[in-house]
Amino acid sequence: MLLPAFPDAREGRPAERTALERVHTPEYLDLLATLTQPTWLDYPNTIASETSWTAALLAAGTAIDAAEMGGFALVRPPGHHAPPHTAMGFCLINNVAVAARHMQAEHGVGRVAIVDFDVHHGNGTQDVFADDDSVLYASLHQAGIYPGTGALGEGGETTVNVPLRPGCGDAEWVHAFERHVEPAVARFRPELLLVSAGFDAHEEEDIYLVDMHVTDDGFRELARRCAALAPRVAAVLEGGYNLATLPRLVSAALDGFSSGNATAG
């Protein structure tokens, strides 16, 4: 789905394997591509089957399309927990990392910033770009929950982790973003901003150990702020598992991206 400047929806296209190889090891991709039965890749969180390769290619390709066109990729499976060599935390392919590498390799984009507001830290994305000063990774997440990474100060010079206490809501969430993420992105001056848009910090989510109280307005405001940080912005869906609220939250984020784009322009 495209951002409001291009208010039409379309089906994504599967990624080429070469795009995935910019992020993931050939051995892991071979394993995923040749599964013939349900197999635990990350017990007890991530199982894959003979159809998972097709789904993973489509998710990654849709993320690439979104990055190219300034869109919002509504995909499953999500991706931000997947490191280069394996699956993890429901994630098979790191969609946002694949999109970032594609834009650098195929479209000459230099600096890419990735802002991740999923309630869980995106350990996979952090790992992919740990030694790459052309990509800034900034994560706003609840402290002390899965996957146990993302401590304050963890990572290199182009990593910004903002762990938040359980129970915080819109005001603390937005303040942390304003204080820590916005200045880091502004200093980095990205040509492209990719958003790992997870909605599982919402007050109506019911996930083990998650205790956040972000509202629809909180997601709208964070999306608005993200859209004002770079000349080109795209988003990829990460977490968010309450099917009764997810469409509403995506709509709120799209509203925010639209108003942020207008402000930036």
Residue ranges and their predicted role:
Residues 1-115, 120-265:
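HDAC/HDAC-like amidohydrolase catalytic core signature
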